[in-house]
UniProtKB/Swiss-Prot annotation:
Name this polypeptide is given: Small ribosomal subunit protein eS17
GO biological process: translation
Entry-linked InterPro entries: Ribosomal_eS17, Ribosomal_eS17_CS, Ribosomal_eS17_sf
Similarity comment text for this entry: Belongs to the eukaryotic ribosomal protein eS17 family.
Cellular compartment(s): Cytoplasm
Entry keyword Glycoprotein: no
Organism of origin: Candida albicans (strain SC5314 / ATCC MYA-2876) (Yeast)
Quaternary structure and partners: Component of the small ribosomal subunit. Mature ribosomes consist of a small (40S) and a large (60S) subunit. The 40S subunit contains about 32 different proteins and 1 molecule of RNA (18S). The 60S subunit contains 45 different proteins and 3 molecules of RNA (25S, 5.8S and 5S).
Chief subcellular location: cytoplasm
Task of the protein: Component of the ribosome, a large ribonucleoprotein complex responsible for the synthesis of proteins in the cell. The small ribosomal subunit (SSU) binds messenger RNAs (mRNAs) and translates the encoded message by selecting cognate aminoacyl-transfer RNA (tRNA) molecules. The large subunit (LSU) contains the ribosomal catalytic site termed the peptidyl transferase center (PTC), which catalyzes the formation of peptide bonds, thereby polymerizing the amino acids delivered by tRNAs into a polypeptide chain.
Amino acid sequence: MGRVRTKTVKRASKVLIERFYPKLTLDFETNKRLTSEIAVIQSKRLRNKIAGYTTHLMKRIQKGPVRGISFKLQEEERERKDQYVPEVSALDLSHTNGQLEIDADTADLVKSLGFKIPVQTVSISAQRGPRRFAKRN
């Protein structure tokens, strides 16, 4: 079974990542050396726990954003995604032969909002991918 990490370890790791993200790596040994250089930590055991949790969080950050941790690079990436504008608008009728192809629910929504857009209702069927596991007999 796993061990419970204390609030001290989690808070220290979070602060380390927010302040020194570019210097940290996915390697425990380098994070341990960096932790001992940056912070004054009372014991070797606590330093190792903080470095280990920092390494764990760095690996999670590589996969995607981690709740509770925000650093400059992550904020810039989020800002870029928020400001994204597509090359061609989905509502641009010049690329779709003068009509929008939408499902029945969306057509009702467009009609209730009072837009005068020529629409073509298309039936949408749920596409089911291949099963991940074989059926049992």
